[in-house]
Amino acid sequence: MQKQLINRLITYAKIDTQSDGDSSTTPSTPGQWDLIHYLKDELKEIGMEEIEVDEYGYLMATLPANSKNDIPTIGFLAHVDTATDFTGKNVNPQIIDYNGGDIVLNETLQVVLSTKEFPELSSYKGHTLITTDGTTLLGADNKAGIAEIMTAMQYLIQHPEIEHGTIRVAFTPDEEIGRGPHKFDVSRFNAKYAYTIDGGPLGELQYESFNAAAAKVTFTGNSVHPGTAKNKMVNSGKIAAEFISKFPEQEAPEHTEGYEGFYHLISIEGDVETTKVYYIIRDHDRNKFENRKDTLRQFATDIQHKYGENAIHVEMEDQYYNMREKIEPVKDIVDIASEAMKQLDIEPIIQPVRGGTDGSQLSYMGLPTPNIFTGGENFHGKYEYVSVQNMEKSTKTIIGIAKLFAEKS
C-alpha cells in the first residue's frame, strides 16, 4: 500500500495544477484538465464504475455496494488544484527515510527543513517522508488525498470480503481559489454523506470551518508629472496605505490561532493613478464575521469622507460559511470517522479548520461533508511534506469508514 501511495503522489505532484483566481473558466487552468483525464483513466484501470467527467472538470465514479443491506451511500472527495501561494511548476518530489535532525531540501539554494523552525518534524523520526526539492510546493494539498482515495478504492475492489455500501468518489477543481463546489452537481453525486480528504497531520478530523469573504478594494488617484504635481497629484498608493493602516495589527493571520478570526491582506498592485488591494476576511463566528465585513466597509467610508466618493470602491463577496451548522444535526458521521481512527490507534484531533474545504460549501448544498487528515504538513510552500506512513493510515481510515457504515446499517 505504501508503494502505491508514493507512486501515485509523485505522479500527481509532477502535473502542474495550480489554479488561477483571475481566470473565468472552470477549471481555471489547463493543467487541472491534465490531471483529471489521468485520474479518469486510472479509475477505470482499478475497476471503478460510472466514471464521468462533466464540462466543468468534475470527475465522479462509483464503487457499487457489495451488500444487500440498506447502507447509506457515502462519498469521498479531494481537489485536483494546488495553491497559488508558491510556484507549482516543475515539482520534483524527494523521498526521505527520515532519521531525525534537519533535512537539506536544496543544497545549492541552502533550503533547509529545520527542527528549530518546524519542531513537529522531530516526531516523524523513522517515517518515510515525501518532500519538495526546495524550489516549489509539493501539492500534497490535496494530491495526497487523491492518492489515498484512489488507493482505498483499489483495496476495497481487491478485497470483496469487506462489506460496504455504494461509495461515490469525486475529484474537483479550483478549491484553492474558493470555487471548488460552485458547479458541483450534488444530485448527480447522489451521496447522503461525504468526507473530504483534505486535512493535515495524523488524526485531524474537522467539521467546523471559517466563514469566509473576499474583498477587492480599488483606489483611484490623479497622476500628474511629479515636477508639476503640487496641489494636483493624488497618489492612490498612499490612500491605499492609509486604508491598510486602519486594520488592527493583531487581527492578522500571523497573530491569530484557534477560533480567532482575521483580516488578511493578500496582495497589492498599482501605481499613482490606480491601486488595487485584495483582502480575505475569516471568522468562525457568523456575527463576528459580519462585523468584520462591516468594519472594512466603514474604513472605506472614512476614506471617502476624506478623499471623495470616487477615491475608493469596494467589491466584496462571501466565499463559504462555517459547515458546523449543517453537520451537527448529523454528527454521527463525525463519530463514525472518529471510531474508524480509534480502531487504527489514531487519536482523533477534532478542531476547527482555520480555512475552508470543499465540504464547507457542499454542506450548505445539502451534502454534509466533514474533513479528514491526509498526513501532510506545511502546505502551500517549499517546506511542505507528507508522511507515507500517515498517508497509509488515512487510506485505512477511509476503508474503516466504509466498513463502519456497513456494520451500523
Curated annotation (Swiss-Prot):
Its cofactor is Zn(2+). It comes from the Bacteria. Transmembrane segments: none annotated. It catalyses: Release of the N-terminal residue from a tripeptide. The active site is at D81, E175. Belongs to the peptidase M20B family. GO terms for cellular component: cytosol. This is Peptidase T. Keywords: Aminopeptidase, Cytoplasm, Hydrolase, Metal-binding, Metalloprotease, Protease, Zinc. Binds 2 Zn(2+) ions per subunit. The lineage of its organism: Bacteria, Bacillati, Bacillota, Bacilli, Bacillales. Zn(2+) 2 binds at D141, E176, H380. Disulfide bonds: none annotated. One of its GO terms (molecular function) is tripeptide aminopeptidase activity. Zn(2+) 1 binds at H79, D141, D198. Its EC number is 3.4.11.4. It is found in: Cytoplasm. GO terms for biological process: peptide catabolic process; proteolysis. Cleaves the N-terminal amino acid of tripeptides. It comes from Oceanobacillus iheyensis (strain DSM 14371 / CIP 107618 / JCM 11309 / KCTC 3954 / HTE831).
